[in-house]
Design a protein with these regions (language model features):
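Short, solvent-exposed polar/charged micro-motifs at secondary-structure junctions
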Residues: 1, 137-142, 173-176
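Accessory nucleic acid-recognition modules appended to NTPase machines
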Residues: 2-134
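Short hydrophobic-aromatic micro-motifs
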Residues: 69, 93-94, 143-145, 164
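A broadly conserved detector of short glycine/acidic/proline-rich loop/turn motifs that flank catalytic sites
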Residues: 79, 98-99, 142, 148, ...
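A structural signal for short secondary-structure junctions
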Residues: 86, 137-138, 157-158
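Conserved catalytic cores of phosphodiester-cleaving nucleases, focusing on short active-site segments
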Residues: 122, 136-152
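A short pocket-lining beta-strand/turn micro-motif at the edge of beta-sheets
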Residues: 132-134, 142, 161
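Long, low-complexity, charge-rich intrinsically disordered regions
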Residues: 146-186
Length: 186
């Protein structure tokens, strides 16, 4: 309940005031967050989302930046172009796991929770982008694949600085790291 109230206040008051948005645009912002919450993480098609909300694709990108600055979503970009800010948005996540349970579907996939947690914790200290071979690339050189206890290393066999992040294990070994340890970064 409380988290939902904070989200509503952020969308209905804080962002519109900060960005000087109209009431109609604030409503579209709320609809955009609802679309993201039902699908996150997902590869955004800005044109398609813009069609649903009856705004341009550029407006969707701008609204997503407002949601990200407000701490409601995280945008995972490609590493192309060398500067993270210029990379194309590859996936959109809800900012944290509490938002998944507050705004998302009742049937939350544990893989979504794991990836969201990892992305949320690492991006506060590092540059996090998409990896061509796994889930995440950190600071342009460390590759991470996030999964459960039985996650294999197939994708990372030929990757230097490749790590498997596993949930439901107490301690790591070799290039395997326990997911809970990333909670210590924050």
């Amino acid at each position: 309940q409380y988290i939902q109230q904070v989200v509503n206040a952020t969308i209905e008051t804080d962002i519109p005031q900060y960005a000087d948005l109209s009431i109609a645009t604030a409503r579209k912002l709320k609809r955009l967050l609802a679309i993201i919450a039902q699908s996150a993480p997902f590869k955004p098609n800005m044109t398609q989302i813009g069609g649903q909300l009856e705004v341009s694709r550029n407006s969707i990108a701008e609204l997503c930046v407002y949601l990200e600055k407000a701490g409601l979503i995280g945008q995972l970009r490609t590493s192309t172009g060398g500067i993270q800010g210029l990379g194309k948005v590859d996936k959109i996540y809800l900012d944290n796991t509490a938002l998944i349970y507050t705004l998302g579907n009742r049937n939350v996939e544990i893989g979504t929770v794991r990836e969201t947690f990892f992305f949320n914790q690492t991006r506060s200290l590092c540059s996090v982008t998409t990896s061509p071979v796994s889930d995440f690339l950190i600071d342009g050189k460390y590759t991470f694949e996030v999964g459960g206890k039985k996650k294999r290393q197939r994708q990372l066999q030929s990757i230097e600085n490749g790590y498997v992040v596993k949930d439901d294990i107490e301690t790591g070994y070799g290039n395997i790291i326990s997911l809970w340890m990333f909670g210590m970064l924050y």
